[in-house]
Regions:
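Alpha-helical transmembrane segments and their helix-start/interface "positive-inside/aromatic belt" motifs
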Residues: 3-23
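Alpha-helical transmembrane segments of multi-pass membrane proteins
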Residues: 21-35
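Pore-lining and gate-forming transmembrane alpha-helices of multi-pass membrane transport proteins
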Residues: 56-64, 110-113, 117-133
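Membrane-helix boundary/juxtamembrane motif in polytopic membrane proteins
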Residues: 79-100, 150-154
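Terminal transmembrane helical module of multi-pass membrane proteins
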Residues: 126-154
Length: 154
């Protein structure tokens, strides 16, 4: 691995740790942030009432669960990349699991559209990212097969 790739991997690892720390901070501060958001941006047509605040807060915490899983999986994938273990079946599996986390986020944000219509856009973005990651996992699988064949022929 050349110096540029090592630097990029280290930056990605650092950003992943920042992401995970941000998720922890968000989990701690979520009730206050949500109350502030609703009080600041509540319009007449907003469907979040005090009765449904608990439902929205629960959905917000549900959004964090796949985020934590995806962050941990990304840290593991970056560890594999730094060791040069890219074209291997476990790497493709990790990418597929991250895609599943994206699909989970898609479903949760689709539920959010009842309260916040902008969540539909986020849901479609998560769906697109999940599909793209499945394609990348398939490419890694093909690359793994080619690498295995080359290892046997050399």
């Amino acid at each position: 691995m050349n110096a540029s790739m090592k630097r990029t991997t280290r930056i990605a690892q650092a950003l992943t740790l920042v992401l995970l720390a941000g998720l922890v901070a968000l989990a701690i501060c979520l009730p206050w942030l949500l109350r502030g958001y609703i009080s600041k941006f509540a319009y007449e047509n907003t469907t979040v009432s005090s009765a449904s605040f608990g439902i929205v807060l629960t959905l917000c915490y549900c959004v964090l669960i796949p985020g934590f899983f995806a962050g941990g999986l990304m840290a593991g994938l970056l560890r594999r990349v730094s060791r040069g273990l890219i074209f291997a079946a476990p790497s493709a599996l990790i990418i597929r699991l991250i895609a599943i986390c994206c699909f989970a986020e898609c479903a949760i944000f689709a539920l959010f559209t009842v309260y916040f219509t902008v969540s539909l856009g986020i849901s479609f973005c998560a769906l697109f990212l999940g599909i793209a990651l499945l394609v990348v996992a398939s490419v890694i699988d093909v690359g793994t097969e080619i690498k295995t064949e080359n290892d046997y022929t050399v």
